[in-house]
Amino acid sequence: MPRLKLTIAYVGTQYHGWQTQARKNASPLPTIQNIIEDAVAHVLGERVHVHGAGRTDAGVHAEAQVAHLDVPESRARMDWQLALNTLLPRDIRIADAVLVPDTFHAQHSAVRKTYEYRLWLSKRYTPPELFPFVWACGSVDVERMGSRSLLGKRDFASLKNAGTDLRTTVRTILSITRTPEGPLPEGCLELTWRFEADGFLKQMVRNTMGLLVAVGRGKLEPADIPGILDACDRRIAPLT
């Protein structure tokens, strides 16, 4: 069957993450995967599994989440972007829909993944339009928040969500960048941290930002980070 690659953007505030979550004797929780599969079923008249590149947690947003599904030959060349966007809620959008070889897999073909985390450096006031998209962490010393010791292939067990059951907690962080770079301009209240890796553990980036913010607040020293990682114990790292 022809394979379709979807690039999906969404505001995750109202959703319980990406993956469908069945409940006994109740309707599934609203998730991105479930909502998209509902729309596909409306088009095809049958339920088709939509494979995502990875799971996202409740409330997480996406600019380019990749997924794939197999569709009948008779429907392969229809305008899937228009068809799905007509059916989907406004906070879930198909940015692109293209046919790909059947060897493509949204998860297994991924070379790297990118995650952004936005900080708002004031607890006094957060603009309402930014509230769902930033962590209002308050004032931090950005110059202390060095992230070099997080780069490379490491065991990130100390920064995974409790209860995560995986074959390995080793991941490779390829780059970490901050916008704006260098000393903050006067009056700057928003920072964006961008992480690129071969993959992420559940809530790994959230917990990493909790660690960096603790350093920025002076609760930890930058030199503490390697020891926290080496401990491979979530209880050692700051709670978020």
Regions found by a protein language model. Give the residues of each.
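Structured-RNA-binding interfaces characteristic of tRNA pseudouridine synthases
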Residues: 1-240
